[in-house]
From Swiss-Prot:
Protein name: Enolase-phosphatase E1
Cofactors, names only: Mg(2+)
Subunit field text: Monomer.
Metabolic or biological pathway: Amino-acid biosynthesis; L-methionine biosynthesis via salvage pathway; L-methionine from S-methyl-5-thio-alpha-D-ribose 1-phosphate: step 3/6; Amino-acid biosynthesis; L-methionine biosynthesis via salvage pathway; L-methionine from S-methyl-5-thio-alpha-D-ribose 1-phosphate: step 4/6
EC supergroup of this enzyme: hydrolase
PANTHER family noted in UniProt: ENOLASE-PHOSPHATASE E1
EC number: 3.1.3.77
Cited function: Bifunctional enzyme that catalyzes the enolization of 2,3-diketo-5-methylthiopentyl-1-phosphate (DK-MTP-1-P) into the intermediate 2-hydroxy-3-keto-5-methylthiopentenyl-1-phosphate (HK-MTPenyl-1-P), which is then dephosphorylated to form the acireductone 1,2-dihydroxy-3-keto-5-methylthiopentene (DHK-MTPene).
Family: Belongs to the HAD-like hydrolase superfamily. MasA/MtnC family.
Amino acid sequence: MITHILLDIEGTTCPTSFVSDTLFPYADTHLEGFLNEHIENNEVQSLIDEAWHEWQADEDPSSKDLLSKAFRENSSEIENICSYLHHLITIDRKSSALKDLQGRIWREGYEKGDISSSLYPETIEVLNKLKQQDYILAVYSSGSISAQKLLYRHTTNGDQTALFSHWFDTRTGNKKESKSYSDISIAMNIPVEKVMFVSDSCAECNAAKKAGMSVLFSLREGNPEQDPHDHQPIKDLRCLFDYLL
């Protein structure tokens, strides 16, 4: 019997277009200014150091070329690390340091009123109904936990964070590795077979299924992946109830 619903965000509860066309460009545009403004902040400096360590260990040829260029040129630390972070954004690398910095930039954007998050039309209705039926709701996204909470706090329909009991990001583990899902079930203190995971990524569904979770593939218009392979697809979150009986 399913008791917990673990939800991806982008392409599952929120259109991919909001993330790709609004959130990512906003963080990309404001990255260098944010780092310059907060360079004295210990947490921000720690994230910059983490990104530097990641860069030096990065085996990707283009990342290595970028690092060699940084050592040759007389650029500032901020300019150099920004070039690497912009590179990670371009190649869609799931870097925890980058995700944390993006979350901090988005927080400022939300608080200034520059950003309001748009969810799928049925998302809030479905989440409320699940909550009313005593399902425990949790989030697992590649975006940082702070970014996840910001997205749900600043929706066009108000604050929805109270709907969720657990939040997980890539610091828990890679979303494409089955161990991450086992660890999540342990963190929620629930047998893995009692969890339903919903995502628009086949690789993530594969990993969750391997761990023992039930899975549904979010097949929405505009999502990058349109082939569910052997996973059960749903085109609307309301369809989720058909698989909880």
